[in-house]
């Protein structure tokens, strides 16, 4: 009877915690959801959170309060990595733009700059039709 070798078994690797003092907060605020990703200067993700992941479903995802809760969640995880200052880059026209920045500031993270990097088309794709209610 063959013996199972224990030396080839999968080992559990210890997660290495990076110590990063400053980073970039990417806020993607669409009309339906808000996604916050906090990265280091090289663009490696440290933490992320969404309004939907924070427990909001349906139309409540697209509220400023849902974006605030998501930003607090992402900010707390990023602070475990030693984040002290953030550069905020906001993309999109959604309602969670301002409240997510305020939530990060309220956590005690210093915000060095806020940049709006919303892509503006040079007359590219046709926009969606206007809503009639």
Curated annotation (Swiss-Prot):
A GO cellular-component term linked to this record: ribonucleoprotein complex
GO MF annotation terms: rRNA binding; structural constituent of ribosome
InterPro entries: Ribosomal_uS11, Ribosomal_uS11_bac-type, Ribosomal_uS11_CS, Ribosomal_uS11_sf
A UniProt-annotated Pfam family: Ribosomal_S11
Sorted UniProt keywords: Ribonucleoprotein, Ribosomal protein, RNA-binding, rRNA-binding
GO biological process: translation
Role noted for this protein: Located on the platform of the 30S subunit, it bridges several disparate RNA helices of the 16S rRNA. Forms part of the Shine-Dalgarno cleft in the 70S ribosome.
Subunit structure: Part of the 30S ribosomal subunit. Interacts with proteins S7 and S18. Binds to IF-3.
Family named by the database record: Belongs to the universal ribosomal protein uS11 family.
PANTHER family, per the entry: 40S RIBOSOMAL PROTEIN S14/30S RIBOSOMAL PROTEIN S11
Protein name: Small ribosomal subunit protein uS11
Organism: Bordetella avium (strain 197N)
Gene: rpsK
